[in-house]
Amino acid sequence: MRIVIYSMLVLLIAIQYPLWLGKGGWLKVYEMEKQVELQEAKNSLLALRNAKLEGDVKDLKDGTRAIEERARVEHGLIKEGEFFVQILPADQSSADTAKASTVKQ
């Protein structure tokens, strides 16, 4: 009788092994679900980035406002008749003024 019980126990373990640790077992399914969640998070970030880039491209194709903004920000260009004003933080302004006054002398 013991032999039958032990053999049944061994067969039960042999049947359960693929379910838990095999190629398509629960552990693999759990790992895959985690990978899918990570990939979905990455995809949503990339979709937001793509939407922003698509808006930039559309604005560059259709309007001049984006081109003017890029020229101002990236290249420091200004329109004719405009004045460029740069406001420095309070701690930097006195130090830069002192440097400028010593350089001019």
From Swiss-Prot:
Residues 1-3 are cytoplasmic. It is found in: Cell inner membrane. The keyword Nucleotide-binding does not apply. GO terms for cellular component: cell division site; cell septum; plasma membrane. InterPro entries: Cell_div_FtsB (IPR023081), FtsL/DivIC (IPR007060). It is a single-pass type II membrane protein. Residues 22-105 are periplasmic. Residues 32-60 form a coiled coil. Keywords: Cell cycle, Cell division, Cell inner membrane, Cell membrane, Coiled coil, Membrane, Transmembrane, Transmembrane helix. GO terms for biological process: FtsZ-dependent cytokinesis. The chain crosses the membrane at residues 4-21. Disulfide bonds: none annotated. Essential cell division protein. May link together the upstream cell division proteins, which are predominantly cytoplasmic, with the downstream cell division proteins, which are predominantly periplasmic. Part of a complex composed of FtsB, FtsL and FtsQ. Belongs to the FtsB family. This is Cell division protein FtsB. It comes from Polynucleobacter asymbioticus (strain DSM 18221 / CIP 109841 / QLW-P1DMWA-1) (Polynucleobacter necessarius subsp. asymbioticus). The gene is ftsB.
